[in-house]
Each structure stands twice: as structure tokens, then as C-alpha cells.
């Protein structure tokens, strides 16, 4: 009996010592720090008091999108654990919250996991000015404090417009970053983004990126971009997991219709495409738009016009239903058929007939204008000739002196 008591005592001592060591290992990580240059590099480091006890150390990174990555940590003689990561190769979602923790393996083959830490991956390439309200947290680079007040006014007007297009309660406050130009926005987005992008919504972090004009007094670009990107945030709050599978023509059509100043080129592009019979079939606009600038512009123009047609004919509730209903892997055309009871091809034809019928009539008139002009001239000549003959006859009969 005494023998077993001794054995149990030694075993419990060993287990308690092991657990204590592991807890101690996690607790003795100190000076945990991160330092990064946006889009370039990230350094994560911590200090451990007993480096000789460490066999291996691993850094875990996880973004709020759920992506998990692991990186080895160097272990220096003074206990510094460090990992340097190239953000050109290991991209982090812009403005995401990044969580990280350390897995430590000891020379006795036990292991320990540290508590979780986090940092916000914001764009630190610029010196940002800010203006906060209960509605918006706005950041910009160029312009005085009064510029921030103007941005607040534009943003509030834009949100009102967006919620009229899509009546959804927004998640407040919304964060807005106003970049000096469109190229700055393109630089931080995925390399697959086309070079015509001037703004972007990041709905998972309730944030939008927009670009200012060279002339800071000209706010029209922002008055167009801000409500457009706000609409994408509203779409996301309505669709959630369905956002990425929603038809591109629907998402962009709603957002384009929310713009304070409609793009004056869109009407011209639609008429030109209709005249040349080069309209893009709507089923080809279910996914991402073409990177070609001209085709993309036509895609936006068609989407806006098509969504306007659907809303006017079937009502706004059908549009919301289309956003809220999971596609369940259905093709875009079949998905639309389930909601509207009409397939996408038939809706496309009906939209073209309703939208371009008047244009076709005008085009026919334009095509035959020489004949019409000649006919009008002949009628005018005939009228004058008749009047002349009547007057001559009256004069010959002595009725006119």
C-alpha cells in the first residue's frame, strides 16, 4: 500500500509539474509586439524567459475572414521570438482585424499555446486626418478640417439615397477612407481588380474606400462613389452569406442607381450598343464584369437600366427577395426564374423592348429623314402653288384689284 502511495505521489507531482510548466510557459511570453508596413512586411515578436527550454515556436495568424496561416519563429539566445513575413506573398485583407497566437514546443516534447492577441491592419502609408460622428468615422489625407465636415454632409446625404434604393437599416458607424486618387485605392486591392476601379466596399468590416478628385472643391466624384459603396454595405447586411453568389448585375445595378449624379455616358453607351446590336446578354453579367473599361461601363449601364425596369414592373420587394433568397448553387437564370416566374432571357428581351422601343422609333425616323424632308418640301411647294393658282384665278376673274 505504501508503495502505491509513493508511486501516486510521484506521478501527481510529475503531472502537476508538467501543467505548471506549460502554464508558466504561456504566461512568461512578454513584450508581445507587431510592426508592419502596409502591403510590404509584418514583424511579430515576443520574449520568452527560458529560451533553452524551447525546441520550436510557431506563429499562428488568422484574419476575421477565417483564413489561418502558420509561420516559424526564430528563437534567439536572449529569448527573442521573431517572425518576419512578406505581405507581398502573404496578403492580409485590407483593414481586417488580425488575430495571432504562439504555439511553443519544449525540449521535453510538451507544448503550450499562448493567449490570443490582435491588431487592426490599417493603411499606415499615409498620415490620416479624421472626423467622427455617430454616423461615420471618416479619414482623409488632403484638405483642412472643413473638408471633413463636407465629407460628413456628403456621406449622410449618400446614406439617405442608398436607403431609399434599398430600405435596410445600416450598421453604424460606417468607416470611410478617402484616398487622394483612384490609383491609391487600386494599389491595396487584389491584383485581379481592374484599373477602372475608383472605390470599393469592404462589407465584412463595414468600411468603404473612395477616391477624391484632384480639385478638392469638386465633390461630384465623391457624391457618386459614396452612395454607390454604401449600397453594397446594405446589400451585404441583407444577403450576408448570399452576397458573393448574388448576380453582379443586381448588386451593381442597385448601387449605380443610388449614385447622386448618374454617369452621363451611360445613356449614350446604351443607345450606341442598341443601335449596333451589341448589348451584352444579361446572363453574361451574372458574375464579375469585364476588366475592359468600355465593356465594364456598358455592363454598369445595362445593370442600372435593367434593375430600374425590374423595380418599376415588379416592385422593390422582388428585388429584396432576390437578394435574400439563397441561390443554392442554381444558375443565375434559373435562380431569377424562381423569384420572378420568368427566366432571365425573357426578362432581358422584355427590358430591351420596353427600354429601346422608343429609341428604335427615333432611329427609324433618323434613317428615313431625307425622304421625310423631301416629302415635307413637296407639300410646302404644293401649298404655295395652290395658293398662287387660286389668287391668279381670282385676279383673272376680276375679283382682285
What do the predicted segments below correspond to?
Residues 127-243, 247, 331-335:
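Juxtacatalytic substrate-recognition/specificity segment
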Residues 58, 173-175, 348-350:
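Residues at or immediately flanking beta-strands
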Residues 55, 98, 134, 172, ...:
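Residues that flank catalytic or metal-binding motifs in active/ligand-binding sites
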Residues 10, 15-128:
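Glycan-association/targeting regions that enable binding to alpha-glucans and other polysaccharides
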Residues 360-401:
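C-terminal single-pass membrane-anchor helix
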Residues 195, 199-209, 220-225, 230-233, ...:
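Acidic/His/Gly-enriched intrinsically disordered linker/tail segments
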Amino acid at each position: 500500500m505504501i508503495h502505491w502511495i509513493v508511486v501516486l505521489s510521484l506521478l501527481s507531482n510529475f503531472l502537476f509539474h508538467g501543467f505548471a510548466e506549460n502554464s508558466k510557459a504561456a504566461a512568461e511570453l512578454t513584450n508581445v509586439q507587431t510592426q508592419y508596413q502596409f502591403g510590404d512586411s509584418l514583424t511579430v515578436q515576443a520574449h520568452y524567459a527560458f529560451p533553452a527550454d524551447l525546441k520550436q515556436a510557431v506563429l499562428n495568424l488568422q484574419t476575421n475572414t477565417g483564413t489561418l496561416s502558420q509561420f516559424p519563429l526564430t528563437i534567439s539566445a536572449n529569448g527573442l521570438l521573431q517572425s518576419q513575413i512578406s505581405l507581398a506573398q502573404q496578403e492580409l485583407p485590407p483593414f481586417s482585424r488580425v488575430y495571432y497566437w504562439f504555439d511553443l514546443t519544449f525540449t521535453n516534447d510538451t507544448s503550450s499555446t499562448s493567449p490570443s492577441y490582435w491588431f487592426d491592419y490599417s493603411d499606415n502609408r499615409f498620415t490620416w486626418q479624421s472626423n467622427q460622428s455617430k454616423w461615420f468615422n471618416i479619414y482623409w489625407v488632403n484638405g483642412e478640417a472643413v473638408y471633413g465636415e463636407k465629407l460628413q454632409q456628403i456621406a449622410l446625404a449618400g446614406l439617405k439615397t442608398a436607403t431609399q434604393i434599398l430600405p435596410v437599416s445600416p450598421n453604424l458607424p460606417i468607416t470611410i477612407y478617402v484616398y487622394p486618387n483612384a490609383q491609391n485605392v487600386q494599389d491595396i486591392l487584389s491584383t485581379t481588380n481592374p484599373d477602372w476601379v475608383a472605390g470599393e466596399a469592404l462589407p465584412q468590416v463595414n468600411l468603404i474606400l473612395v477616391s477624391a478628385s484632384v480639385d478638392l472643391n469638386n465633390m461630384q466624384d465623391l457624391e457618386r462613389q459614396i452612395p454607390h459603396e454604401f449600397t453594397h454595405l446594405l446589400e451585404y447586411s441583407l444577403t450576408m452569406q448570399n452576397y458573393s453568389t448574388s448576380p453582379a448585375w443586381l448588386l451593381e445595378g442597385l448601387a449605380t442607381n443610388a449614385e447622386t449624379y448618374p454617369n452621363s455616358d451611360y445613356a449614350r453607351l446604351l443607345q450606341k450598343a442598341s443601335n449596333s446590336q451589341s448589348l451584352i446578354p444579361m446572363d453574361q453579367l451574372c458574375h464579375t464584369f469585364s476588366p475592359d473599361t468600355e465593356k465594364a461601363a456598358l455592363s454598369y449601364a445595362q445593370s442600372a437600366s435593367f434593375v430600374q425596369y425590374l423595380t418599376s414592373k415588379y416592385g422593390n420587394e422582388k428585388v429584396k427577395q432576390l437578394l435574400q433568397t439563397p441561390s443554392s448553387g442554381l444558375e443565375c437564370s434559373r435562380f431569377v426564374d424562381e423569384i420572378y416566374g420568368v427566366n432571365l432571357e425573357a426578362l432581358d428581351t422584355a427590358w430591351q423592348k420596353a427600354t429601346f422601343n422608343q429609341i428604335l422609333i427615333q432611329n427609324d425616323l433618323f434613317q428615313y429623314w431625307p425622304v421625310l424632308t423631301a416629302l415635307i418640301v413637296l407639300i410646302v411647294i404644293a401649298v404655295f402653288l395652290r395658293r398662287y393658282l387660286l389668287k391668279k384665278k381670282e385676279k383673272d376673274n376680276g375679283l382682285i384689284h
